[in-house]
A protein has these predicted regions:
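N-terminal glycine-rich FAD/FM-binding segment characteristic of electron-transfer flavoproteins
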Residues: 1-335
Length: 335
């Protein structure tokens, strides 16, 4: 089939209160590289009520062009409204590739949009590659419970769509001196399209929010903790450091901590400045979710644990003795 009319790589920039969410800016990093390999543009696409800040951020993080749709209907994410607006844009501009963050919103938006466009979608990707000759994208994602990595291609329809996990790619350093074309589109949403309405938005208390993808410090616990109650050791150190609490799949499968804390191929992919792995053996599935961390500290009583092979610093010892000392020292330094 001839897809020569389909050009450019689009990155959907999710917003919150008019500000660009981190995942969209992360995706501009590979998006720009892949688009330029094809000799095409990396286009940031934004739907919202007031996109001024998000437009500036997208340009600073590398977008060659921005398509911005502003309307009160897009102030908050709405499945029907966003699908309607993006469908109109895709039909008009015909992008070859469309990348969406695999957030709660992206996991709802991506499948519905791909269905509307009658094209394929690869979900929860952790790696991307493109064939410069054919323009075909290779979307790689975990399969069979994270035991295999599958690369999926969409050869017969366009656009090629995929959702990509937050934290897989790091944002480039922003360049606030960059300029790029901003195309303003007006796409009002017909009343009969909207079947659901946001009545009230309630934000969780900051202390209860788990933002592993945005955390600069993560303290994670694994099977070595032995039971749910022992996650208090992890929380104490995380609180002292001002970090977030993570966990291995083994700890989550044991029911010691909710899945939202899981790091790894079947959990979240993170890249904090500091990652402390406590009682985690370091299976390849876990490493895939945190190996991009700037500094990795491993604490395990088994000197042959695989986690030590990727750790910058290793402590061979009993975590129940090590963690209280670390927590006390951190508190002492802070005081």
């Amino acid at each position: 089939m001839d897809f020569s009319a389909y050009q450019n790589l689009w990155v959907f920039i999710e917003t919150d209160d008019g500000k660009a969410a981190s995942v969209g800016l992360e995706l501009l990093h590979p998006g720009v590289e892949l688009a330029h390999q094809l000799g095409q543009k990396a286009v940031a696409v934004i739907l919202g009520k007031d996109n001024t800040e998000a437009e500036k951020a997208a340009i600073a993080y590398g977008a060659d062009q921005v398509i911005s749709v502003e309307d009160p209907a897009y102030e908050y994410y709405n499945t029907e409204a966003y699908t309607y607006g993006m469908t109109k844009l895709v039909e008009k501009y015909q992008p070859s590739i469309l990348m969406i963050g695999a957030t709660i919103i992206g996991r709802d938006f991506g499948p519905r949009l791909s269905c509307r466009l009658k094209t394929g979608l690869t979900a929860d990707c952790t790696s991307l590659a493109v064939d410069a000759e054919t323009g075909i994208m290779g979307w790689t994602r975990p399969a069979f419970g994270g035991n295999l990595m599958a690369t999926i291609m969409c050869e017969n329809t366009r656009p090629q769509m995929g959702t990509v996990r937050p934290g897989v790619f790091k944002k480039t350093a922003p360049d606030n001196t960059r300029t790029a074309e901003v195309i303003k589109e007006s796409i009002p949403v017909p009343a009969d399209v909207i079947r659901t309405t946001l009545i009230e938005s309630i934000r969780e208390a900051a202390a209860e929010m788990v933002k592993l993808e945005d955390a600069e410090i993560i303290v994670s616990g694994g099977r070595g903790l032995g039971k749910a109650e022992n996650f208090s050791y992890i929380r104490d150190l995380a609180d002292a450091l001002g970090g977030a609490v993570g966990a291995s799949r083994a700890a989550v499968d044991a029911g010691w901590i909710p899945h939202v804390h899981q790091v790894g191929q079947t959990g979240k992919t993170v890249a904090p400045k500091l990652y402390i792995a406590c009682g985690i053996s370091g299976a390849i599935q876990h490493q895939a979710g945190m190996s991009g961390s700037d500094c990795i500290v491993a604490i395990n009583k088994d000197p042959d644990a695989p986690i030590f092979s990727i750790a910058d610093y290793g402590i061979v010892g009993d975590l129940f003795q090590v963690l209280p000392v670390m927590t006390a020292e951190v508190k002492k330094l802070k005081s």
